[in-house]
Amino acid sequence: MREVTIERNTNETQIELTLNLDGAGRYQVDTGCGFLNHMLELFARHGRFDLVLTCHGDVEVDYHHTAEDVGIALGQAFAAALGEMRGIRRYGNFYLPMDEALVLCAVDLSGRATLNWDVHCKTEKVGDFDVECVSEFWLGFARNVPATVHFVQFAGENTHHILEACFKGAGRALAEAVRIDAAHRDEIPSTKGLLV
């Protein structure tokens, strides 16, 4: 079973996270930020990952450190759960329609950290959550797997719908990328023999 628990503690956030890549989409998330909780719950559900996460952050300042550090911790958890990435499919992508919004998420668990964030929301906030924190979350994630992650928005007017499509699409794309390829269970999916 590919399941890990990690802790990440800084002067800004204290995070405990348990991730099971072979789960059923169960979640228990408390980041101190309702919108981020909602997005992570959608991510876990649509990726079929079991996720238990608590974060105590300096939310009296804003949600920036919480979003960034949770992304870092989630990336670290994926890295630990995947190990040397033997037998995985490596690549995954998903077009996610959410009402009028349409977003592509494409992932390569390459060992190389890249985020392409081609998402354009028309508002700067959803409730009291700064929209720019979402790209910081995914940058922290990509750097710590490490992985190449692309988000490309094709349509969308409603900021909540656009960001929801991003998190659901990422869950679906990552579910495909981490899936074990039964025909190549013992192989590392790279001609180099190593994913770095």
Label every PLM stretch briefly.
Residues M1-V196:
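N-terminal intrinsically disordered, cationic/polar leader segments
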